[in-house]
Design a protein with these regions (language model features):
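Short, solvent-exposed loop/beta-turn-alpha elements that line the ligand-binding surface or hinge
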Residues: 57, 209-214, 280-289
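Pocket-lining segment of extracytoplasmic ligand-binding domains
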Residues: 91, 166, 172-262
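Secondary-structure end/capping motifs
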Residues: 229-307
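Short polybasic/polar patches that bind polyanions
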Residues: 56, 154, 197, 262, ...
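Conserved C-terminal helix/tail region of periplasmic/extracytoplasmic solute-binding proteins
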Residues: 298-333
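Solvent-exposed, polar/charged alpha-helical surfaces in well-ordered, non-transmembrane soluble domains
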Residues: 53, 76, 80, 94, ...
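Short, glycine-/small- and polar/acidic-enriched structural segments
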Residues: 26-161, 165-168, 184-190, 201-206, ...
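Short, low-complexity disordered leader/linker segments with a strong preference
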Residues: 1-34, 329-333
Length: 333
């Protein structure tokens, strides 16, 4: 059974379980509408949206579906019609969804940055130009953290391919590899990169924002085009919930950090450190950063991240949907 097949079976099983256990929705504008939302155990507003019932209180029935195969798995489930919404990184999403170009659109961002390059505390690496012939652990060869790492090297005049890459697949896996000495460099993401500094096994070399010289586009929601077409008001309510939950992170950091840490199954200190040291931050605007995304994926194209016969900058302009976020923000009190 291949990866896509395993992912779809897992999503179907999760939906079956949730359809049995989902509580009845309240009366409201969303009554009779079910939203299947895929999520990952990462730093996000999802746990706040869930605990505060921001969608359910409007009448929606929400199936919160855990995704274990990363954004590629979520993309497969969205394309197959098993998920309506998925949380993910805006840059990775362009690369991955370009293989199913009409399946979905990125509709609203919460964060910037989040992708960070760390080196071992035992390493003599001082800057990106020193990363040549090194062992580098990544979560995947086509992920956003790997892309921002390679952009940083390219900017420093270094050939990113002049290193040996190891794929860990998970954040905790990267922590373990660095701790064991299996790699000298980590192209990682929060909160696990923060954990490396707190454990004094690694130090931050540069962030995604450092790599591109501006706020690095981060994470947000991706919606299937079918769901957008059939339930545009539900899309707006989803964004209202996302933006309210993200506002909560800014206004109630102590409670939010605890909630996000429990959700991601990490220490609260790592989440707090990630925000306080600007390894991740709340975006200045929740509207997708089209210019930043297009500029970043243009470099991704040069670095070989694009699937065959795909022009990532052209696709990104189609994939980023700013209209819903702009409308929701314009009508906020």
């Amino acid at each position: 059974m291949n990866l896509v097949r395993r992912t779809l079976v897992a999503v179907a099983a999760s939906l079956a379980l949730f359809s049995i256990g989902t509580a009845g929705a309240a009366d409201g504008p969303g009554k009779g509408i079910t939203i299947n939302i895929g999520y990952f155990p990462v730093v996000s507003p999802v746990p706040i949206m869930r605990t505060q019932h921001l969608l359910e209180d409007k009448g929606y029935t929400v199936n919160w579906v855990p995704i274990t195969q990363g954004l590629p798995g979520a993309a497969s489930a969205v394309a197959a019609g098993q998920l309506d919404i998925a949380w993910g990184n805006s840059i990775s999403a362009v690369v991955i969804f370009s293989q199913s170009p009409d399946a979905a659109q990125f509709i609203g961002q919460s964060f910037i940055n989040a992708n960070v390059t760390v080196v071992s505390t035992k390493s003599d690496i001082k800057s990106a130009k020193d990363i040549v012939g090194k062992k580098v652990v990544v979560s995947g060869m086509k992920t956003a953290s790997t892309l921002f790492f390679q952009i940083g090297l390219k900017k420093a005049g270094v050939d990113p391919t002049a290193n040996e890459y190891f794929v860990s697949g998970t954040g905790p896996g990267m922590v373990g590899v660095l701790d064991s000495g299996g790699a000298e460099v980590v192209a990682g993401y929060v909160p696990y990169v923060a954990d490396m500094e707190l454990k004094k096994i690694g130090r931050v070399l540069f962030t995604g924002s450092d790599a591109i010289g501006r706020a690095a586009p981060g994470d947000g929601f991706i919606a299937s085009t079918k769901f957008i077409r059939e339930h545009p008001e539900a899309v707006k309510d989803l964004l209202r919930a996302q933006f309210a939950a993200t506002d909560y992170i800014k206004s109630n950091p102590n409670e939010a950090y605890k909630s996000m840490a429990e959700f991601a199954k990490v220490d609260e200190a790592a989440v707090r450190y990630s925000f306080e040291k600007n390894l991740i931050g709340v975006a200045s605007s929740y509207v997708p950063d089209v210019d930043g995304i297009v500029a970043t994926v243009a470099v991704a194209q040069e670095l070989g991240f694009a699937p065959k016969d795909v022009d990532l900058p052209t696709y990104a302009k189609k994939f980023e949907n700013t209209s819903f976020a702009r409308e929701v923000l314009a009508k906020r009190p």
